[in-house]
Amino acid sequence: MKDFLPAFWAVIPAAGIGARMAADRPKQYLSLGGLTILEHSLLCFLDHPRLKGLVISLAVDDPYWAALPCAHDTRIQRVDGGSERSGSVLNALLHLHAQGASDNDWVLVHDAARPNLARSDLDNLLGELADDPVGGLLAVPARDTLKRADSSGRVLETVDRSLVWQAFTPQMFRLGALHRALADSLVSNVSITDEASAIEWAGQSPRLIEGRSDNIKVTRPEDLEWLRQRRSEFGR
């Protein structure tokens, strides 16, 4: 009998340049513990038995990818990235559809510069959302006091942090639903900052799955220094 259980795919949008790092190359190709940030971001998925494959969206003129050992891994499929994150993810989804993936399959979108994803967080996300009608994302409840500001940088009010979460990745949604949400938002010229915001715009409510706070995205030089120090301390 044919198995109709949905498959799980990973998508890594990696076409950005990370200008705030002020580095000589895109931040995903900076070194962290003997590997690039991007390689660390990929490994958690490549080592997971439930993942069927991985699609990475890269800049058309990317000169760094081909030199990495993982570029020759048959589990990884490369597509061209877009000018924005949403376009890069959409190109990966189009590729999955072209390869015969089902609308009912799950897609986990993960930041290329988020190299510290714990296996336990990935396992928990898969376990909690595999039967969810919408999908969801790893997130962390806000810890610090939050202020809403006006355009001049002055405080308007203090925000109730008990209702605020910081969105992380992976973000996990059905292939068909995410494809439609991203495509429709692009046609409507809606600003989409992550996959969850596209699903929200489509009228759905993604579920928040609490993850580890050290699953940080490398955005500024101090983020990378923190990760290097942490890996040095824990021998990773």
From Swiss-Prot:
The keyword Ribosomal protein does not apply. GO terms for biological process: isopentenyl diphosphate biosynthetic process, methylerythritol 4-phosphate pathway. It catalyses: 2-C-methyl-D-erythritol 4-phosphate + CTP + H(+) = 4-CDP-2-C-methyl-D-erythritol + diphosphate. Its EC number is 2.7.7.60. Pathway: Isoprenoid biosynthesis; isopentenyl diphosphate biosynthesis via DXP pathway; isopentenyl diphosphate from 1-deoxy-D-xylulose 5-phosphate: step 2/6. The record marks R161, K217 as: Positions MEP for the nucleophilic attack. Belongs to the IspD/TarI cytidylyltransferase family. IspD subfamily. Catalyzes the formation of 4-diphosphocytidyl-2-C-methyl-D-erythritol from CTP and 2-C-methyl-D-erythritol 4-phosphate (MEP). This is 2-C-methyl-D-erythritol 4-phosphate cytidylyltransferase. The gene is ispD.
